[in-house]
Amino acid sequence: MQRRAFLMRAGAGVAATAVGRPAIAQTGAPVRWRLATSWPKSLDTLYGSVEAMCQRVGQLTDRKFQIQSFAGGEIVPPLQVWDATQNGTVECGHTLTSFNIGKNPAVAFDSGLAFGLNTRQQQAWMNYGGGLELIRALFKKDGILPIPCGNVGVQMGGFYRKEINSVDDLKGLKFRIGGLGGMILAKLGVVPLQIPTADIYPSLERGAIDAAEWIGPYDDEKLGLHKVAKYYYYPGWWEGSAQVTLLVNLQHWEALPESYRAALEAACAETTVLMMAKYDTRNPEALRRLVAAGVQLRQFPRPVLDACYKAAFETYDELAGRSADFKLIYESWQKFLADSNLWFRVAENTLDNYRFAMSAQPR
């Protein structure tokens, strides 16, 4: 309802201001946009989903609205997609917004918080729990409109050169990780380093870092991380849901006709569903291949997870005390998390835990 209401309000705004708007917004004339991403083309699920989204927009608008996608580094560096969208270098960009917590830590709610909402919960909060409205109000300050456009689901905990048997093993660990996850781990002695995707493998290979996380088995295999580190840990508690987002320059968004806006939002919603389905299909197969290649699967010890959980919520409380933006969104997020977890504990997790246990037994 809230998404539909947003589109209705946007359409009303277009009609009310048609006289003073560019001709494009009045006539539905052809539009050509450039889209910068943070992804290399080798990541065919992530970058490929962006390409498919662009094609879908064209289909929905009889080819009048064309968006051309570019891999990370082709127009701007992978970690500068936000800036390029904000300053109008490109009309839009596709990225993980937690790369930009240095601008405002509250942007992390868009991509997902450690020990927070899972993929389905994130989608529910964004679309029907008030999350999208709060995040759009935040991003508007930078002249950006965010549109959820994909989700990679829960992540793995990364590849490590050494085993992690205790909290002490985290101290001094040079770890490729971005976002609030890095801030949380720094409390436990980790040295977090935000490195672009294409630089992860060479950094791990030459020993510039001791460990690296990216997404999950399919993409991690694509990057070849298993060739330079053998211990593969789980779960990736820092992102139980990693939503990726289309950032749109607000001026360019406001210049679009209502039908083009609707097409773009519809294509992004479709991309979210299909991206999750692709990862859920491809990750199991990739995990089997990695294990067959000699990768050593390891679960983070419970004391390590407990320490990280404590540090995570201490970090959130500290940020809420310093940032009015963070506090406002955190209050909404916390309530939704508590309510949603109650339902998941009663139904989803009870059934899942039982069937997982039974599937591990001989029939």
Model regions and ranges:
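N-terminal secretory/targeting leader peptides
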Residues: 2-122, 130-363
